[in-house]
Amino acid sequence: RRFANGLPANNALLWGARGTGKSSLVKAIHTEINGDIAGALILIEVHREDIPSLPLLLMYLRDQKNRFLLFCDDLSFDAKDDSYKSLKAILEGGIEGRPENVLFYATSNRRHLMARDMIENERSTAIHSSEAVEEKVSLSDRFGLWLGFHNCDQNTYFAIVERYADYYGLKME
């Protein structure tokens, strides 16, 4: 809401177990904000394969009057993929800086966006293993907001929903 109203906001990484509603939450936020202020936020889905072309998109969006939420669903990287470096530069703002009218939200099953075995392999094979690992893990640090979605059983889920319903005064049947 802050971002849609022209105020600064953080890029966000929603990470956690599959099927816990990460993508649904991003889409619901977009719908909610546009329900309050029609057209306040334009959602653009970005595929991982499109990350290298993001600088061109940002250059175009920079001059637009609208606010944009770039959304990459199920983001992760494998050992042979170095496009995470491009994303890191984009999240940091690069030389030109991230446009004030653009935010980046991503969902992932991985907190650090890299497979654990990929990170551990860097530890075992690199000359300066801690530096190599830090470079790969630091991508997730570029997101100002991290939201973790943890698995829970059905009873715990129902308890969470009931507490929220009570808090917001919602009637449940």
Model-derived features: where do they sit?
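Walker A/P-loop nucleotide-binding motif
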Residues: 6-27
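Conserved nucleotide-binding/hydrolysis micro-motifs of P-loop NTPases
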Residues: 49-52, 75-78, 104-114, 151-157
